[in-house]
């Protein structure tokens, strides 16, 4: 049986492999997702300048749901990050799932961001 520590180490190795290929530019920054057991975080990053342009998480003051570690919370974070990105003039991004499977909360966040107007 794989332990939680081993699973996270495998995820980090997978993310490092993927990060060699995915690179965010000023025209098309990277939408990065990080997931913990209780919260989910999304950042839009310009890798050319190494700057976070927009971020959203379940810890934000605008976040109004009580439960923070479920699919509904991920959808809300996806909408928030897309809304903030569109306010800054960002329409196209590169999706970086952070080494996680494209399923569940990660997929819900991505779908909500797409529906709110981001293209990837």
From Swiss-Prot:
Pfam families: Ribosomal_L18p. It comes from the Bacteria. Disulfide bonds: none annotated. GO terms for biological process: translation. Keywords: Ribonucleoprotein, Ribosomal protein, RNA-binding, rRNA-binding. Coiled coil: none annotated. GO terms for cellular component: cytosolic large ribosomal subunit. The keyword Cytoplasm does not apply. One of its GO terms (molecular function) is structural constituent of ribosome. InterPro entries: Ribosomal_uL18_bac-type (IPR004389), Ribosomal_uL18_bac/euk (IPR005484). Belongs to the universal ribosomal protein uL18 family. PANTHER family: 39S RIBOSOMAL PROTEIN L18, MITOCHONDRIAL, LARGE RIBOSOMAL SUBUNIT PROTEIN UL18M. This is one of the proteins that bind and probably mediate the attachment of the 5S RNA into the large ribosomal subunit, where it forms part of the central protuberance. Part of the 50S ribosomal subunit; part of the 5S rRNA/L5/L18/L25 subcomplex. Contacts the 5S and 23S rRNAs. This is Large ribosomal subunit protein uL18. It comes from Geobacillus sp. (strain WCH70).
